[in-house]
């Protein structure tokens, strides 16, 4: 009789841990870089404080800053998702679909390591 696999093995979880940690490191670096740009930590010039610059670039600058804030928020959410994935790995619940309780395919977890739903569950969830 076949037994249904209810969780990934410890070796598989360690493989996923390496993937998650790699993505987390990159995400944190990207977030830090975005925050540097937002807070002008990399510049020593006065170009963005001169009245001429402000008059000409106010709209563009405002839009760019809004986009950067949005990017930073998305990156922060991604980091939180990856940190939650690490907790699920520690708890040995990583890769289990939160709706069906079945294992999420490895291919999906490699592509989206913070996933908590299989593609099918996600589509069904959106339809409701």
Question: What does each model-found stretch correspond to?
Answer:
Residues 1-88, 128:
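Interaction interfaces in information-processing and related assembly proteins
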Residues 62, 95-98:
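Short, flexible micro-motifs
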Residues 89-95:
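Glycine-centered tight-turn and secondary-structure capping sites
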Residues 97-100, 118:
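Short cysteine-rich clusters marking metal-coordination/redox-active sites
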Residues 104, 125:
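Cys/His-rich microdomains that often coordinate metals
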Residues 107-112:
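Short Cys/His-rich "knuckle" micro-motifs
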Residues 113-123:
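Cysteine-rich micro-motifs
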């Amino acid at each position: 009789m076949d037994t249904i696999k209810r969780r990934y093995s410890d070796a598989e979880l360690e493989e996923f841990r390496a993937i998650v940690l790699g993505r987390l490191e990159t995400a944190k670096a990207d977030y830090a870089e975005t925050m540097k740009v937002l807070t002008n930590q990399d510049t020593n010039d006065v170009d963005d404080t001169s009245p001429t610059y402000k008059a000409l670039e106010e709209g563009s600058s405002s839009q760019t800053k809004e986009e950067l804030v949005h990017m930073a928020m998305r990156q922060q959410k991604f980091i939180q998702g990856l940190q939650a994935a690490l907790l699920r790995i520690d708890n040995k619940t990583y890769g289990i679909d939160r709706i069906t309780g079945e294992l999420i395919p490895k291919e999906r977890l490699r592509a989206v390591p913070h996933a908590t739903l299989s593609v099918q569950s996600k589509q069904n969830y959106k339809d409701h």
